Amino acid sequence: NNTFGSYNTLKNNVEFGTGLMGEKFAFDGRLSQITSDGYMDRASSDLKSFYLSVGYFGKTEILKAVMFSGHECTYQAWYGVPLNYLESNRTYNPYDYENEVDNYGQTHYQLHYSKKANENTNVNISGHYTHGEGYYEQFKGGEDLADYGLENILIGNDTITESNLIRRKWLNNDFGGFTFSLNHKMEKLNLT
């Protein structure tokens, strides 16, 4: 599946699904990518993702493993166009540093198990883990060196206390856990 759009926007998808094989197993997957130059100056984007799952479907139980991930690299265009540019330059972007980007990826892992104990009762257990990592990079003009843990620079009798900098802030995060449910149906009441 391919789609083309304004501002050199391109979306590509490839997906597959086996359906139930041998009355017990199924595999599904998808790859996606979106790229665009963006409407605003230097507001490009490059987005990639995938999804994979494998499942076992028994008579009284289901076991399914899922993994999906995405990565994005986008040029910054957070601020709107100033009023004085609306008539003459509607695509104006105040960010002019060539690598003013947000670059981040995140991957999710999940394992799901469901067991039908009897006609009225089933148990569900799921585990999940997510890892994310990335940064944003930006130009910062006239920054105090001390704010970055840097010492002043002495050149002859002159002391330099501020400078233009390229700043990159990183994020590296992990999250995981488990969920559990027991469902029981009675004549006039459902318990979870």
What is the role of each PLM region?
Residues 4-35, 40-75, 104, 109-121:
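Transmembrane beta-barrel wall of Gram-negative outer-membrane proteins
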Residues 104-192:
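Face-selective signature of the C-terminal outer-membrane beta-barrel domain
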Residues 36, 41, 60-109, 132-139, ...:
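Flexible loop and strand-edge segments within Gram-negative outer membrane beta-barrel domains
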Residues 49-52, 64, 86-89, 146-148:
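Short, intrinsically disordered/low-complexity patches at protein termini
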Residues 20-25, 81-85, 149-154:
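Short hydrophobic/aromatic-rich motifs at helix boundaries and adjacent loops
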Residues 28-32, 88-91, 157-160:
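A short alpha-helix capping/helix-coil boundary motif
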